[in-house]
Curated annotation (Swiss-Prot):
Function, as annotated: Antenna complexes are light-harvesting systems, which transfer the excitation energy to the reaction centers.
Source organism of the structure: Rhodocyclus tenuis
Residues annotated as binding a bacteriochlorophyll: 38
PROSITE patterns in UniProt: ANTENNA_COMP_BETA
GO BP annotations listed: photosynthesis, light reaction
Pfam families the record matches: LHC
Ranges in the topological domain labelled Cytoplasmic: 1-21
Family named by the database record: Belongs to the antenna complex beta subunit family.
Disulfide-linked positions: none
GO cellular component, one term: plasma membrane light-harvesting complex
Quaternary organization: The core complex is formed by different alpha and beta chains, binding bacteriochlorophyll molecules, and arranged most probably in tetrameric structures disposed around the reaction center. The non-pigmented gamma chains may constitute additional components.
Single GO MF annotation: metal ion binding
TM region positions: 22-44
Record-given protein name: Light-harvesting polypeptide B-800/860 beta chain
Amino acid sequence: ADANKVWPTGLTVAEAEELHTYVTNGFRVFVGIAVVAHVLVFAAHPWGRGGALVA
């Protein structure tokens, strides 16, 4: 067993940190796209205060 590898992934600390940056950046892109999508939907069909989705 390699002492530099971290259980349970088998990645080194440096590899894990690199992977974490990719995952974090991917999440940021996902959230950004979701925010833009929500703004566009709200602009087309406002919700709340008597909107179509509120009884």
